[in-house]
Amino acid sequence: MTDHTQQFASDNYSGICPEAWAAMAEANRGHERAYGDDQWTARASDYFRQLFETDCEVFFAFNGTAANSLALAALCQSYHSVICSETAHVETDECGAPEFFSNGSKLLLAQTEVGKLTPASIRDIALKRQDIHYPKPRVVTLTQATEVGTVYRPDELKAISATCKELGLHLHMDGARFSNACAFLGCSPAELSWKAGVDVLCFGGTKNGMAVGEAILFFNRDLAEDFDYRCKQAGQLASKMRFLAAPWVGVLQDDAWLRYADHANRCARLLAELVADVPGVSLMFPVEANGVFLQLSEPAIEALRARGWRFYTFIGEGGARFMCSWDTDIERVRELARDIRLVMGA
């Protein structure tokens, strides 16, 4: 039976996947040591090292804003700057947290191509000024998959990494939808991270079947010095850390993280296919992850809302974002597509 509560405004609307829920229930049996000194945190960390094929440093935070902000703060000083895209979550949706936790590191906005930074755009910003009056560029942060649903290929990441190394910049990846990027490309997590030159990855779980929690992976272990103190100071050291870590065990041990991301991606592609022939509807960006960005008429947008659909319209006049989730019902996708056809007069 179709779940009519399902919406497409955000993949944060979805609930908790069975694997994460079961792991939390198992972790709830009896007592465990506190503050991350427990078997679940150790197991989750080891699963990440196995998955990424490297001995990375692993930390856990409650949400993506904290993960990104603390990771960036570890990579630069207050007089440094961070190069990001104009649509980056750290720029538009984190309430100044990256600047706050870094004691003032400035975000410098670079131009993008279909939501993605390029070596040229990074170079333009990094070399724009090199005098002492300008915040010294120190970090590049990119989002995988991007805020507009596009995905960096390994060669693109390697080219960006090479530019970063040439210019003395660290490379941070906001991986709120990293799982969706892996599922789309069929690449291993290692190929899309440290093997492509990424220093630090914030791996998102909340948008892919978990209740709360992101993992921060330092592939360059030297950059993780005293990071546990940063987490504690920022209120990110959970006393019962096992309940942040256990869901990761649940989703990682049998590759549920990848299956669910692939399902969300397939639902997004289905939606795009079902409305591809509707007059007046066009894709704003390629559908590569779990988001569909459609150009619609303003009356159609209002008509969809009047029919009870929830979605975001922060991407310009007539632009609408529809996000699919780990548990999106295929029939619900078809219902949305039918209503889009209806309100567009098709």
UniProtKB/Swiss-Prot annotation:
Gene3D superfamilies (UniProt xref): Aspartate Aminotransferase, domain 1 (3.90.1150.10), Type I PLP-dependent aspartate aminotransferase-like (Major domain) (3.40.640.10)
Cofactor section: pyridoxal 5'-phosphate
Substrates-to-products reaction catalysed: L-threonine = acetaldehyde + glycine; L-allo-threonine = acetaldehyde + glycine
One GO MF term attached to the UniProt entry: L-allo-threonine aldolase activity
InterPro entries: ArAA_b-elim_lyase/Thr_aldolase, Low_specificity_L-TA_bact, PyrdxlP-dep_Trfase, PyrdxlP-dep_Trfase_major, PyrdxlP-dep_Trfase_small
EC number: 4.1.2.48
SUPFAM superfamilies, sorted: PLP-dependent transferases
Pfam families xrefs: Beta_elim_lyase (PF01212)
CDD domains membership: TA_like
Keywords (A to Z) from UniProt: Lyase, Pyridoxal phosphate
Class in the EC hierarchy, top level: lyase
GO biological process, one term: threonine catabolic process
Modified residue annotations for N6-(pyridoxal phosphate)lysine: K207
Record function comment: Catalyzes the cleavage of L-allo-threonine and L-threonine to glycine and acetaldehyde.
PANTHER family xrefs: L-THREONINE ALDOLASE-RELATED (PTHR48097), LOW SPECIFICITY L-THREONINE ALDOLASE (PTHR48097:SF5)
Subunit text: Homotetramer.
Protein family: Belongs to the threonine aldolase family.
Protein name (record): Low specificity L-threonine aldolase
Organism field: Pseudomonas aeruginosa (strain ATCC 15692 / DSM 22644 / CIP 104116 / JCM 14847 / LMG 12228 / 1C / PRS 101 / PAO1)
Protein encoded by which gene: ltaE
